[in-house]
Structure formats: structure tokens, C-alpha cells
């Protein structure tokens, strides 16, 4: 009993030290747990495809039989996927890449001049906008220099008065429409005509009219013949 009491007495003063040590251990354990949690998070962020690499490998083996060259490690597979991402990623073309100038500018630049020698230094070509501004400034200065023409003099009082109405003269050179029609009627029948005395609708008379038209008019009327009555004044 004495020995046990002595042992207990000896252990009692050591208790606060052990408690401090236990606290230290707990603090160290907490720091270690935090470090482990950080490591776990870090490992998860880096190896997010650790479980799905096998499925990716099986898919590549099915669709791309020759793709087993980069299947030795996850790093090679990851680099291969990154290369595919960069290779097949869409490239957005800007108007500057296609046309050589930005689309926000309404003025199209002039085409480049002929290539100069290699030894000579290339001078910066002035832009079309600067050229047009200079031309506009020159034109405005020239307009300012030109004197304005004097205003026209006011018209005399005689011209400002309204003109008197003119009496209408005889129309068509003093002739009426009936006189003009009578004068023009004989000229309408001056072309050669063919008179058909017999029945027009008979085949024989129509054939005779065609023959006579060939002799007089020198026209072949066999393809189409159109006959109508035309009043001809008797001589």
C-alpha cells in the first residue's frame, strides 16, 4: 500500500506536465489533421480523374485501337487529353485577322504598296483616314478662299408684270382634222392590192388569189392567209 501511495504521489506532480503534453499532442494532432485535410483536398483537385481513367482508357481502346501508346500512365493520358483540347478547341477569328483591319472602323485602308528592298527601312504608311481628313481640310480651305458670287440683280418692273394671254392660233397649221384625214386617205391605199372578184371562201378562188399574190407581191402566202374586206375607192 505504501508503495502504491508513493507511486501515486509521485505521479500527481507529473499530471499537469502530462496534461500540457496531452494538450500539445492534441494541438499537434489538430495541425496534422488540418494538414491531412489540405493534402486530401489537394490530391482530389489534382487527381479528379483517378477513378475515371479506366473508363477513358477502355473507350479509347474501343474507338482508337492505336491509342495504347500513351496509356502507360495517367500523366501521359492527361497530357494527351490536354493536347486534344487545344487541338480541337474553336478558334474565333476576328475581322482584324481576316481583313487586316478592325471592323469598328468605317474607313477601309488603302492596299499596301509594292514591297521595298530589304536593306531599306520601311516607312509607316499613312492611314486612309488621315489622308481623307487632310483632303477635307484642303477642300474647306479652298472653298473659304473662293469669293462668293454677287447676288443677281432684281428683275425690272416690266418683267415682273404678268404676261397677257395670247390668242390661240389655228391648230394643225390652220387645217381641221377632216382635211388632214382626207389628205392622208389616198396615201393609205397606195400599196399594191389584189382584187378577188369571185367567192373568197372557195378553195379555187383562194388558190388563184395566192398565185396572183406571188406574181404581183412576190410573197408566198401558203403558210398563212388572212383575208378581210378593205374598201378601195373606185378610180
Swiss-Prot record:
Pfam families: CCDC71L. Keywords: Phosphoprotein. It comes from the Eukaryota. Residues 1-13, 120-148 have a biased composition (Basic residues). Residues 149-159 have a biased composition (Pro residues). The modification Phosphoserine is found at residues 52, 89, 198. InterPro entries: Ccdc71/71L. The modification Phosphothreonine is found at residue 185. Residues 1-30, 109-167 are annotated as: Disordered. This is Coiled-coil domain-containing protein 71L. It comes from Homo sapiens (Human). The lineage of its organism: Eukaryota, Metazoa, Chordata, Craniata, Vertebrata.
